[in-house]
Amino acid sequence: MIRLGLYSLLASIALVLFAQCTSGKSSGSETDPSGDSAQVAAGVVDGKLVFPPKPSMMVSDFAGVLTDSIRGLEDDLRRYASEVPIEIMVVSMAHIGDGDVWQLAHEMGKRWHLAEKERAVLILIVPKSPDGSAQAAIFASQGIRHIFSETYCRGVVSNVMQPLLNDKNYYGAAAATVEDVLKTLSNVQL
């Protein structure tokens, strides 16, 4: 518990520093070069959602809930990317304020240029929403959206992820979702 709290504190400090460096002020806002004023988050800073640039890692644990498992999950995702090929990213965010987790996943996919890729999936985990429950969403790129429709993704969140998230097994939820995505892809001709 202490370790998780320390990682959450460090992640919050890093987000504040990131927001100050990228915006030049302490408001935590970020200007989108496309002119789109929608904001999504890696956390809430000064009451505003902060969205980081696309990380180089396939696992971004902004919430500090995957800390012991990141290396193994990162290695697995890189191996899958070379074998399948598909880019799967797992992102955890400490909180998203009143934001909609599905809209955030979609916006993150667009901003990180996953949307136009042939095969990319983003798995977003928010361990604590305003109502206290964990939330998750799955975003699929345009090239595989016919396989991973919104209905399919919502079903995976409800049936695969949510039971594990309710038990605070965030790594298990991410790993089970990755497994489900790969199993589904293996049953479909791309």
What are these regions (language model features)?
Residues 2-6, 16-120, 127-190:
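A structural boundary signal for the start of the first folded domain, especially the loop/turn
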